[in-house]
Amino acid sequence: QANDRFFVLQEDFFNYNPTYVYLLVLWSYLFPQMGALTAVKSIGVVLDLAGAYWIFRWVSRGMNQRSIDRAGSSTTNVTDRTSPAQPPLRSRPAIAAVTLLLTPTVILNSSYWGQCDMGYSMAVLAGLYGLSYGAPRWGLVGLTLGLALKLQAVFTYPLLAVLLLQPRSSLRWSHLWVIPVTYLATLVPAAIAGHPWLHLLTVYWRQFNTYDRLTLNAPSIYQWFPQADYTAFTRLGLLLSASLTLALIWHLVRRYDRFTPPQLLQAALGFNLLLPWLLPKMHDRYLFSAEVLALTLAFFRPRFLPVAIATVVISLGSYAPYLLGREIIPLRGLAIGLGVVGIGVWRDLLGPVSQVNRFQQKTPES
């Protein structure tokens, strides 16, 4: 507010994409008397509500199609199989939204820590919704806005390669112009304010080179190699992550000629669990989008509820060293847990299926 609000964007005081700074500027106009810390936390809470809206949309759409408990099942063969362990269909979207808002890491991330990880996670959830339900261009807009908020949105991007190669997917190569156009559009206000274009375009490269540690409290495999050579293991981690990602893309394309919405969520979750586990230089908050996706998937397929709970617990445990100054659960143990959860999700997605109607995969009843 002391720097003429909008034109503060020309200053070099942030090392991330300016999209979040736009929200701070907007808040300074809407609530000029609000303190800085309150403004930051209130933005996080608003983004939490937006995330709750999108999980409500996801689950509500699934209820309307009445096909959430069996991937690939015909809607005419699915009946309401609610039980005491599963909330009634009509109330499930609202329960999903409230559950997200009351998740411990969601509360800590926004209201306590003042972070905005729900912003990119909500955008990813919205983007996947568009890709699932016949609006691929809007889906790409959502994913790109997620990337414009936080680089962690890139964990979901391998899924785009799968969709592009699937013969029955609604995503086409001709849709990809949406990504650069949307991303560049998020930079225009800062450029108009006087921020150099080169600085804006290279922000994530500078961010990547900010830290020279293999892990920053992330429950990744590097917790087991505390004395490893930074340069060698960074290169090895990048190579391993890229190789395994390409292999998984290949297997998914061979396995599915298109995804049902729950399968798309599961594949996105798989990448959001795997990449923070394998990549070097990951932070403690980088499982946030995996938590959101896991919770959403759990309301489609209740058998994934243990996955959602485990993901939240692992993520919450990784917050402790920074917020409390000590480990509540050893990070090495959390790294093992994340590996088990991630491998389990991928094993379920790529496991044996009936050769009858192969691409309309029939999974066991949830």
Spans of model-derived segments:
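Extracytosolic helix-loop segments that constitute the early lumenal/periplasmic catalytic or substrate-binding loops
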Residues: Q1-Y22, L26-F31, H195-V203
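Loop-to-helix entry region of an early transmembrane alpha helix in multi-pass inner-membrane enzymes
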Residues: P18, Y22, Q33-Y53, Y230-S241
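Specific aromatic-rich, kink-prone transmembrane helix
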Residues: W54, G119-P136, L293-A294
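Aromatic/glycine/proline-enriched transmembrane-helix motif characteristic
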Residues: V203, Q207-L278
